[in-house]
């Protein structure tokens, strides 16, 4: 057995997590919180080992003195390895992963709507099988991204008529982007989210409301009821909906104009600016968006429930909950790392909780009281 190269360890708060790249990160069953034994085993599995070999390695490391010690180690090692296999982090061989490649590069992601390849120079190519007007989208490697996203072309879309269309990734032309045809609008979100990630911004799958001068995100998978809950706030006259499906969050760094920042951190690693929500025209099928920026108050992880109640979340669980709702690119470990770094930073300064809710107004009343208490206690 050997570890799947699409998995890696990421430090979140005081804990270590094993996370996959790609769409699997949206599934909690693919995420593992690692203890000391799991970290040791993960390190050993960087080369091919039989699980039975791990029993001996761990017995020697911990100095098993008798059969009882060996039995305990056997059970613990077996349980950790079973968890690795269950999540897909441990595989029979690298060859069994069947990584496909063509002239564009190694394939990282394949779905009905998009296929992503990694190029030899570290960039990416996105292909849209169902689109008529857009075929390939070419993204520069991170090293090619300059500091000022307003001054040069950042991505190219190739349509099937072989015409190269260059767009500027600029806050100045978001109004124009909103008028694009459907395929171009969807295609431009990919490079926009990629280069936003490079400067410390992530898209969260969520509906959002403006309440008490701050934006609050209700994050959940499609069909959970995030739009329904947001409409409760609007119906009761307490808030207005800012975006019905996708919200771009980051830190508001002064001095860079138009909301774009080179980085959310200074050279010592300290956070710069306060958490912020940036208006974009991407809003799923809701049709609701604003091209304005607001302070971010908090993120509520939404779950359907038979009764309304709020569950406090640890910092680490809050980060994992938000990370699972990120729709910014996480095609490889480098991009997962960027998502983790941004979200772990923002999560320090916002309210995070989990709301189990019904479709009744009582869910709105409960959440409003919770936010009021949070704000009044600051």
What is each of the regions a protein language model found here?
Residues 3, 12, 51-52, 206-207, ...:
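Glycine-rich, often acidic-flanked micro-motifs
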Residues 229-230:
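Post-Walker A alpha-helix
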Residues 30-112:
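Long, charge-rich, low-complexity alpha-helical segments
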Residues 1-43:
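Acidic, low-complexity/disordered tracts enriched in E/D and polar residues
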Residues 226:
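Conserved lysine of the Walker
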Residues 105-139:
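Short Lys/Arg-enriched alpha/beta "domain-start" segment
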